[in-house]
């Protein structure tokens, strides 16, 4: 399915992702791949995607659009298991319509020479739930920055991650949830195990807009 400009309207007009995020800006500037998934009304679907780069010295700029229509449910597994010398810059733009659910699993197990920069922006309408679980086993650098907006009542976002780092590896992690309506719920938890000289950062933030405060 062709990706249209309007698929990114919500994303492009919001200020949840910083305008000076140069990785996101580079993704838009040098975009060279992407996919679009639409789960139709009231469908229950399971999908597994293996993101594999076959050649060395490549930089993948990939922008994906995932839409769950009203009453639908999607279980999505994304695997990143690259063993070559390349870089993947991924942006997922996710929309959940009323009463929809998305369980999103990100499995990251790359070699020391493969860098993964992954950013996501999810927007949740009334009674929808977005659950994201990140598993980082990579030996190469990984940046996980994930943002969610709860734009209508009774919507939920649950952003969780776990990372296992060793040697001189580094990982940067960030989650940010905006409550833009009343009676919404969110959860942000990242945990990690570091050995040797490995380093990691994690920043989480929850913003409750005035209109969402009772």
Predicted stretch roles:
Residues 6:
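Acidic-histidine catalytic/liganding microenvironments
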Residues 3, 13-214:
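Conserved beta-strand/loop scaffold segments within soluble protein domains that form the structured core
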